[in-house]
From Swiss-Prot:
May contain a selenide-sulfide bond between Cys-44 and Sec-47. This bond is speculated to serve as redox-active pair. It is found in: Endoplasmic reticulum membrane. Residues 1-21 form the signal peptide. There is a cross-link at residues 44-47 (Cysteinyl-selenocysteine (Cys-Sec)). This is Thioredoxin reductase-like selenoprotein T1b. The gene is selenot1b.
Amino acid sequence: METRCLYLLLVCVLSVNHATADNGSIKKMKMQYTGFPLLKFQICVSUGYRRVFEEYTRVLTQRYPDIRIEGENFLPQPLYRHIASFLSVFKLVVIGLIILGKNPFTYLHIETPGIWLWAQENKIYACTMVFFLSNMIENQCMSTGAFEVTLNDVPVWSKLQSGHLPSMQQLVQILENEMKLSVHMDSLPHRRA
């Protein structure tokens, strides 16, 4: 009975996974053939660039109604993501051990450090300190400072390379130049080889 339930669960998971994979490829195909330019922003959400992206999107949508605009979080390198994930779990374990009054050093046959004894005597301060210190390190690991802009998968602006955000005028000028260039390239006669 148990194996039948596991088999049924496995079949359900695989069918849902297959259905979502097909749906994603159909959506991607539909978006490929819309013909409208795609302006894509990759931003550091933890750096506070979401508002800048929303403001730019609002202005650019009014000025260029035919442009599709997408935004996504620019992820840090995998090493930093793994460090941040580890810290988020590790801090909860440490806070749990402090609250429960458990001493993990006795299991490791290590002498208990003085800071652990202090944490056991001052649980609220210790838990608060562990929480905020860990969050600070996690945020530092996840912050990329990125504000990358591509038009039809061609990079048009990179804060990581330039060191600053584009102004609205700069972004509009770049878009107009790229649009003129693409219209000019489309109007050239095609040569046959």
